[in-house]
Amino acid sequence: MKTYMNGGGSKVLFDYSDIRPKGAMLVTSGGKAPGPQPLKECLVKIEGMLREKENGTQLTTLEAHDIVCHIADAVLAGGIRRAALISLFNADDDQMISCKSGNWWETNPQRGRANNSACLMRHKITKEFFLDLWERVEKSGAGFFVSSIGTRAKEISKEVSMNK
């Protein structure tokens, strides 16, 4: 990333010659090699995202998340996806909370590679904040919570479930 962003206009070149050609048999796992194409497509998508950034402009958490998801899309063995992701983010990160809302599977299918979880700090959670977050997660149909200290999120969650 540093080379690309701070390279002074230098083009980053990749050598794909050591990647097994498409269709080569995989002895250990079975199946056939996908060849270099999935990696090439991944790098083109990531380069497109980076080009949209002004030199030195920081990536948003969602942009970083999408880059990792594109990389996961490129991880294939025998034609089968071999990557699993979990993205942990601040519970007040609106972009990450809503990244699987709407028709994301059509506009950003790479996001399907990740389990997205909001990190909650026990001493900072209010019932109102949790309920708002819970409602947003229910609407998107995706996402979980990770309580980094204690079980306050679980306590509130149980209370919410019992009051429905």
Residue ranges and their predicted role:
Residues 1-18, 25-28, 32-164:
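Conserved catalytic cores of very large enzyme subunits
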